[in-house]
């Protein structure tokens, strides 16, 4: 830790970027993985959504920052899956809503750091929002009936929200620890 504290400001910024980049890449790599306990009715957790919520809450980002990160993550997810409907719109909405939620409710940092329940609840709600946005995109494309979209959406939204909220602490707490370490290094 002493060696890290002697790093230059540019090196610390690079370390912070490296932690962010590597954590996003790990979430992308585990996105298609289906291990025991990671699947419910054929649906897995939305790792990028979990990462975006953790990043938006912990880093206290601006609305524009969260929207741009949601856009990037959405395009990365679209590159791995079908681009229509896009995941970018849903992740932009999630990023913006998470920042607005953080700013309007001002959830105390000590509660978020020691208790996984607020993070799990936020991830649950945001997963439902994200799947609803994707369902609305399916409806706007017009190639499916509303009843078909609605019945499928209920199953997908609930399974995704349950799994994502249960797995949220696995992403949030290690990232929180790494971001705290890099933030402490930035303090003089």
What are these regions (language model features)?
Residues 1-188:
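Terminal, non-globular segments
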């Amino acid at each position: 830790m002493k060696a890290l504290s002697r790093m230059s400001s540019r090196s610390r910024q690079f370390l912070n970027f490296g932690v962010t980049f590597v954590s996003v890449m790990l979430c992308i790599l585990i996105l298609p993985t289906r291990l025991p306990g990671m699947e419910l009715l054929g649906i897995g957790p939305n790792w990028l959504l979990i990462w975006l919520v953790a990043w938006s809450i912990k880093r206290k980002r601006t609305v524009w920052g969260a929207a741009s990160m949601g856009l990037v993550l959405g395009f990365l997810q679209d590159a791995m899956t079908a681009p229509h409907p896009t995941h970018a719109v849903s992740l932009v909405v999630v990023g913006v809503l998470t920042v607005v939620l953080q700013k309007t409710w001002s959830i105390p940092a000590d509660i978020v750091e020691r208790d996984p329940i607020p993070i799990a609840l936020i991830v649950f709600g945001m997963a439902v929002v994200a799947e609803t946005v994707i369902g609305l995109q399916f409806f706007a494309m017009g190639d499916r009936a509303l009843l078909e979209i609605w019945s499928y959406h209920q199953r997908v939204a609930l399974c995704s929200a349950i799994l994502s909220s249960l797995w949220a602490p696995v992403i949030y707490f290690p990232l929180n620890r790494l971001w705290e370490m890099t933030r402490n290094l930035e303090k003089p």
